[in-house]
């Protein structure tokens, strides 16, 4: 385990790989050498990083299948990114989480639409009642049967006949 974290050991392995590649491929003008070296470096790094991580994860976790699946998906996604692909591999758990998030957001939006619709209906009903209260209704005949103080009211005919209904008929003075 100490050798896995040792930087000198890692650098010596990379140097050994490069020396081996140089000895195998004698032609210095070979065009594919940097690509091969890059792929081998990435594979070596993945090997050195994933083996101890998976050992620790398997010892500490209760569900080793999910850990292994997650590590493999991560390695495949890393290789796809290095190859230049934009697509990624996802496991069912991530898809289910995304679907749950989408369904939750849709429910939230439906509740908001329901609240807004209810408020709009209430506003329309309020505007209708305000409109009904503000509209004037034409009245042909005024019903005077509910009026008070009708005993002293003179009609228009008495006024026309020359008698003023507002003049007192008797004048009394106190002494």
Swiss-Prot record:
The N-glycosyl content is primarily Man(9)GlcNAc, with a small amount of Man(8)GlcNAc. GO terms for molecular function: channel activity; metal ion binding; toxin activity. Ca(2+) binds at residues 120, 123. Keywords: Activation of host autophagy by virus, Calcium, Enterotoxin, Glycoprotein, Host endoplasmic reticulum, Host membrane, Host-virus interaction, Ion channel, Ion transport, Membrane, Metal-binding, Secreted, Signal-anchor, Toxin, Transmembrane, Transmembrane helix, Transport, Viral ion channel, Virulence. It holds the Pfam family Rota_NSP4. Residues 52-175 are cytoplasmic. One of its GO terms (biological process) is symbiont-mediated activation of host autophagy. InterPro entries: Rotavirus_NSP4. Glycans are attached at residues 8, 18. Its main location: host cell. Plays an essential role in the virus replication cycle by acting as a viroporin. Creates a pore in the host endoplasmic reticulum and as a consequence releases Ca(2+) in the cytoplasm of infected cell. In turn, high levels of cytoplasmic calcium trigger membrane trafficking and transport of viral ER-associated proteins to viroplasms, sites of viral genome replication and immature particle assembly. Binds 1 calcium ion per tetramer. Belongs to the rotavirus NSP4 family. This is Non-structural glycoprotein 4. The lineage of its organism: Viruses, Riboviria, Orthornavirae, Duplornaviricota, Resentoviricetes.
